[in-house]
Amino acid sequence: MDPDGAGTLREGATGPEVTELQQRLLRIPDVYRDGATSGSYDPTLTAAVARFQLWYGIRGDETGVYGNDTRAALESRTAPVSG
């Protein structure tokens, strides 16, 4: 079990959940500029998550890790991603 909670994503993760994260971050100005929606949690995505956490004062997750606190903050600022 991940200490940051179920559904936590971090560098090295892949899949549709990562793609959704990438798509949501692209909607926040200047956080993930020109970022890929490849479904791969790479160093660029880690930096974008860390930037989002810093800019919005999210402290409940490790820096660059998409845990429960970061997920809640991002989802509250972006509409659901349509498949």
Question: What spans do the regions from the language model cover?
Answer:
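Acidic, Ser/Thr/Pro/Gly-enriched interdomain connector segments
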Residues: M1-T44, V81
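Extracellular LysM carbohydrate-binding repeats and other cell-envelope/extracellular binding modules
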Residues: L45, A50-G83
